[in-house]
Design a protein with these regions (language model features):
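Membrane-embedded alpha-helical bundles of polytopic integral membrane proteins
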Residues: 2-212
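Short helical (or helix-break) motifs at transmembrane helix termini and adjacent helical loops
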Residues: 144-155, 218-230
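Re-entrant/interfacial helical elements at transmembrane boundaries that shape
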Residues: 155-156, 227-233, 255, 259-260
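Residue-level recognition of oxygen-bearing side chains
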Residues: 167, 171, 246, 259
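Hydrophobic transmembrane alpha-helical segments of multi-pass transport and channel proteins
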Residues: 212-220, 247-255
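Interfacial loop-to-transmembrane junctions
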Residues: 230-253
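Juxtamembrane boundary at the C-terminal end of a transmembrane helix
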Residues: 262-269
Length: 269
């Protein structure tokens, strides 16, 4: 199991580098595909569609695609309109097929657009910032890096449960280790890339601060995804990534972290 997780993790890192470094259309298409797969996993878990692919799911996917097109065409001022249009599409399916769908399915369909597609899109938006190729790294340090540090510290000295009912294996000590580890990794990252990233303000201290805040947010994202799985009585969202589960199982913390790293980078750097 560990070997499978490790190999899958290496493949994910290679894919991340191969899409983030060139950015542009390569990253856009990759994120759009990941978002749609993640939405499908969430819709299945939340029973938006009982069997097959129905109108409600298609409305959610269409809304996500329209939102992503505003980013591709560099028309970010229309992104809010795109999100509202997604809501109109979903509500249209609801009213014109009534009583096929229930209100909770409608809310889940719209939740999928925002929770998965919109929030993941901030990886692309961060990449498009000045020095964005380097800033995207902070998203993954704050999520995957923090998670690894939290796991190691928790295994070594974890005693006090962070969320005993929801996630019994997570400890307060592990959480602290995750935040501290992310801050340290962020600082080291700044030192390593300074030769290629001379932008003012991109100091080790700032990167450490951003990664520490991002790590705190990533814990919420991780636990939130776990809470949904517990509510729906499923172990994983999917089986796409061997040893990890589905897209949402691997990107649960990234989903929450990406928007905050984007805004922190805009404010602090």
């Amino acid at each position: 199991m560990f070997k499978t997780r490790l190999l899958s993790g290496i493949v994910l890192i290679i894919i991340a580098l191969a899409t983030i470094i060139p950015g542009g259309i390569v990253l856009f298409v990759t994120l759009a595909a990941i978002s749609l797969i993640g939405m499908q996993e969430l819709y299945k878990a939340m029973k938006v569609q009982e069997k097959g692919v129905g109108g409600l799911e298609l409305a959610g996917y269409a809304g996500a695609v329209i939102y992503y097109l505003t980013l591709l065409l560099d028309k970010e001022e229309f992104s809010l309109i795109a999100i509202l249009f997604a809501l109109v599409l979903i509500m249209s399916v609801y009213v014109f097929t009534y009583p096929k769908y229930h209100a909770d399915q409608i809310m889940a369909a719209m939740f999928g657009v925002i929770y998965v597609a919109v929030m993941l899109s901030y990886i692309y938006k961060t990449r498009n910032l000045e020095s964005g190729a380097w800033l995207v790294g902070l998203i993954f340090i704050s999520s995957w890096g923090s998670d690894t540090c939290a796991y190691c510290v928790g295994m070594l000295i974890g005693k006090h449960k962070m969320a005993p009912v929801l996630s019994p294996k997570k400890s307060v000590e592990g959480g602290i280790g995750g935040v501290a580890g992310a801050a340290l990794l962020g600082a080291l990252y700044a030192v390593v890339i300074v030769k290629w990233n001379p932008a003012s303000g991109h100091t080790a201290l700032m990167y450490a601060l951003i990664c520490a805040v991002g790590a705190l947010i990533s814990m919420v994202g991780d636990l939130a995804a776990s809470a949904i799985k517990r509510n729906k009585e499923i172990k994983d969202y999917g089986r796409l990534i061997p040893g990890h589960g589905g897209i949402l199982d691997r990107f649960d913390s990234v989903i929450f972290t990406a928007p905050f790293i984007y805004f922190l980078a805009n404010v602090l750097l």
